[in-house]
From Swiss-Prot:
The lineage of its organism: Eukaryota, Viridiplantae, Streptophyta, Embryophyta, Tracheophyta. The gene is CAND2. GO terms for cellular component: plasma membrane. Keywords: Cell membrane, Developmental protein, G-protein coupled receptor, Membrane, Receptor, Transducer, Transmembrane, Transmembrane helix. It is a multi-pass membrane protein. GO terms for molecular function: melatonin binding; melatonin receptor activity. InterPro entries: TPRA1/CAND2/CAND8 (IPR018781). Expressed at low levels in seedlings. This is Protein CANDIDATE G-PROTEIN COUPLED RECEPTOR 2.
């Protein structure tokens, strides 16, 4: 435990928070040097900006493929990915609000909607995963988003009650006073997520794997999310027991989630869909050329 404490005290890791971190340095000064630290904020902002820029760069081609494929669920998922990416970009750029006096309410609202949006994408993908294959009908869209909407609606309601009803600082980390009840709630939250990903991981390695899509990308996605949520669960449990190393470790998992989850989701789900569209177009072109007699000479 002494080694863990020394790691948490290291000047090269994410800075700890205090209630008045930006009281003397202002918004910019707090963002650069005090609220979480320069490295923490820079990684978040750069990763989110690069991903939004990539989405914008690919937007014309992606919209063209979506309109040709006419997959309702993919169109809706792509649109929601854009919305959540912009929310996450705002969240990453406004980190100083977390430790700026007077910004607690707006920070809680921004974090609540950003994390709920990202969780909606997670739950939607898991719900869609259990359908076995890509579906393009309105029924599949309704079923997937109905499940996700119910789960996220309940999650958002409970968090709002704890935030604004009981005054539990769910989204404001304070190293000077560890709120054990808050971290107990996060332990339950992370335990549920880790349990779901663990169940799917087990299914992929059991006789029930035929019920899931036979796609290596999905298996890798589940493995990464299981590891991330397992590590986050461990960090929350440590923090709930008063270990400052747990707070530092939780900060690392939070950075990884907000910086890299949306790109991981895109690579796993949408990029694969767009690649399939390219292959489908190549097959169509080949069939048309074959029907036109372009390959007759090869058989002579």
């Amino acid at each position: 435990m002494r080694v863990l404490s020394e790691i948490a005290e290291s000047p090269f890791v994410i800075s700890r928070l205090s209630p008045d971190s930006t009281a003397t340095g202002g918004f910019i000064g707090g963002w650069v040097g005090k609220c979480h630290g320069f490295l923490h904020n820079t990684v978040l902002v750069l990763a989110s900006i690069l991903f939004v820029a990539y989405l914008a760069y690919e937007a014309k081609k992606s919209l063209s493929k979506l309109s040709n494929r006419r997959s309702y669920i993919m169109i809706a998922y792509y649109g929601f990915l854009w919305l959540v990416s912009l929310l996450n970009l705002a969240w990453c750029c406004l980190q100083a609000w977390e430790c700026t006096p007077g910004k607690e309410v707006i920070w809680n609202l921004l974090t609540l909607f950003t994390t709920s949006g990202m969780l909606f994408l997670e739950v939607s993908l898991v719900a869609f995963l259990f359908q076995g294959n890509y579906a393009s009908g309105a029924e599949a869209l309704t079923r997937t988003f109905l499940i996700s909407g119910l789960v996220i609606g309940l999650d958002l309601l409970l968090k709002a009650i704890y935030l604004f009803g009981f005054g539990v600082p769910l989204f404001i980390d304070n190293n000077e006073h560890i709120h054990k009840f808050k971290w107990g709630l996060w332990v339950i939250h992370k335990l549920l997520l880790a349990g779901i990903y663990g169940m799917i991981f087990f299914m992929y390695n059991s006789k029930w794997r035929e019920r899931l899509p036979a796609r290596p990308a999905f298996y890798k996605y589940i493995t990464v999310m299981l590891a991330l949520n397992g590590l986050s669960l461990f960090a929350c449990a440590l923090t709930a027991n008063g270990a400052h190393f747990g707070l530092w470790l939780y900060g690392i998992t939070s950075v990884c989630y907000h910086a890299f989850y949306l790109p991981l989701l895109y690579v796993t789900f949408l990029a694969d869909f767009f690649q399939e569209e390219d292959l489908n177009l190549e097959n169509v072109y080949y069939s048309e050329m074959k029907d036109a007699g372009f390959f007759d000479a090869d058989w002579e």
